[in-house]
């Protein structure tokens, strides 16, 4: 008999694009078939202020923390904060750098993003990541016209991780939440340039993810937030909005982030 699949939060903090962390985290998570990692990616974290925002998010959804941060002061802060919160924390590159240093006899150069070639493509990706982080969860709706892609959907339909995945490929991606009976921002409805794509999932999947998100946390509308009938209403409203504006819809229930991104890029290829 199969054990029911459980969920855990995997927080990935990087001072560059986060691709190294993502690969390492997924390689480790793949060894645990009955535990699904809910990924939270924080790229371009290079200041204490940015780190504060990261830990505010981690505090809401505690889990495993992996990081690659060159600045040793920031790295120590990550270790100290995780220790204070009782969270497991690993610097992914530090053990590898220690081996290199021991063998080569010289310390590492400590260059941010040194594994990436600093060419035009790299800077395009960094620009896209900056844009995507600034336009997460409906932020700065007034300049959504500058996006290449806008993802819309109800809470917990993988909008943010999919946005970051696309940004890592140099695509400026904004995402906007759909809230039951609430209108969408006017700038989005009037936008001509970006491809707008709706993301949905089954009510069962969304309820499961939301319940896991709220474990150990208080939420005034807990019952409504995880109620499948209520979620079905949210999804019906989301479909209605997408149909009204002729936006394509992708069901992410059984798709990985990569598969969802591939489907979006296929739509983008048709529209450009």
UniProtKB/Swiss-Prot annotation:
The keyword Magnesium does not apply. PANTHER family: PYRUVATE, PHOSPHATE DIKINASE REGULATORY PROTEIN 1, CHLOROPLASTIC. Its EC number is 2.7.11.32, 2.7.4.27. Bifunctional serine/threonine kinase and phosphorylase involved in the regulation of the pyruvate, phosphate dikinase (PPDK) by catalyzing its phosphorylation/dephosphorylation. ADP binds at residues 153-160. This is Putative pyruvate, phosphate dikinase regulatory protein. Keywords: Kinase, Nucleotide-binding, Serine/threonine-protein kinase, Transferase. Pfam families: Kinase-PPPase. The lineage of its organism: Bacteria, Pseudomonadati, Pseudomonadota, Alphaproteobacteria, Hyphomicrobiales. Signal peptide: none annotated. It catalyses: N(tele)-phospho-L-histidyl/L-threonyl-[pyruvate, phosphate dikinase] + ADP = N(tele)-phospho-L-histidyl/O-phospho-L-threonyl-[pyruvate, phosphate dikinase] + AMP + H(+); N(tele)-phospho-L-histidyl/O-phospho-L-threonyl-[pyruvate, phosphate dikinase] + phosphate + H(+) = N(tele)-phospho-L-histidyl/L-threonyl-[pyruvate, phosphate dikinase] + diphosphate. GO terms for molecular function: ADP binding; ATP binding; phosphotransferase activity, phosphate group as acceptor; protein serine/threonine kinase activity. Belongs to the pyruvate, phosphate/water dikinase regulatory protein family. PDRP subfamily. It comes from Chelativorans sp. (strain BNC1).
């Amino acid at each position: 008999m199969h054990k029911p699949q459980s969920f855990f939060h995997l927080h990935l903090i990087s001072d560059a694009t986060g691709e190294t962390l993502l690969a390492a985290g997924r390689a480790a998570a793949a060894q645990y078939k009955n535990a699904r990692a809910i990924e939270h990616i924080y790229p371009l974290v290079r200041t204490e202020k940015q780190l504060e925002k990261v830990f505010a998010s981690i505090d809401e959804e505690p889990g495993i923390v992996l990081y690659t941060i060159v600045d040793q002061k920031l790295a120590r802060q990550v270790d100290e904060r995780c220790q204070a919160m009782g969270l497991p924390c690993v610097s992914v590159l530090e053990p590898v750098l220690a081996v290199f240093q021991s063998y080569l006899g010289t310390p590492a150069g400590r260059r941010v993003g040194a594994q990436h070639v600093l060419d035009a493509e790299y800077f395009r990706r960094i620009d896209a990541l900056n844009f995507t982080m600034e336009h997460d969860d409906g932020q700065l709706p007034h300049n959504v016209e500058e996006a290449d892609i806008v993802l819309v959907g109800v809470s917990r339909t993988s909008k943010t991780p999919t946005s970051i995945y696309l940004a890592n490929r140099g695509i400026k991606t904004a995402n906007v939440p759909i809230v039951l009976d609430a209108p969408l921002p006017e700038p989005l409805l009037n936008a001509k340039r970006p491809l707008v794509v709706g993301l949905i999932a089954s009510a069962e999947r969304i309820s499961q993810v939301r319940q896991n998100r709220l474990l150990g946390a208080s939420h005034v509308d807990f019952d409504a937030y995880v109620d499948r009938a209520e979620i079905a209403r949210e999804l019906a409203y989301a479909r209605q909005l997408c149909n009204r504006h002729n936006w394509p819809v992708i069901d992410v229930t059984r798709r990985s982030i990569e598969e969802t991104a591939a489907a979006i890029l296929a739509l983008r290829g048709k529209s450009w």
